[in-house]
Amino acid sequence: KNEAEMNTVVVVVSAMAGETDRLIELSKLFGDNPNKREFDALISTGEKVSASLLAMALNSLGLKAKSYSAAQVSLKTTSNFSKAKILDIDKAKMEEILSDGSIPIITGFQGITETGEVTTLGRGGSDTTAVAIAASLEANRCDIYTDVDGIYTTDPRVVPNAKKLDAISMEGMLELAGQGAK
């Protein structure tokens, strides 16, 4: 890879603090057991708002940025609503997006099925998305910015005896992120 390719930035965003919980509460307006397809369609919107706002903020600073949904980058998942697993990321599509020189701001936490249905990955899904995209692009590194001070075997805010890791491979990180680690 040349120097420009090695310094390319891809941003994966999560919803703003509290937004996913707010959307979950909205989903209960018509009962405690909403349709799973519609539930995922609703709660995936928080990341779309974050991606668009971040792209607007970067553009206002003179940087070229564009927001993309998981569907637009062809991030394919299983059809398990709210607990989908990433099956494939279209590397050619990602490289096409990167080729225009913009900073891609991609929605985390979600994907699409082979039939185009929106699915969500469950809590921690944006971290999973970031690691999966980094792996698909053979990135040198994947930085996760969060409210936790390192990589833990599970969410330390939920499990007090979670263990902090000194180092981890990309494959190991992908596995842990898929299980909700922080």
Positions of the model-derived regions?
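Nucleotide/pyrophosphate-binding catalytic subdomain
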Residues: 1-182
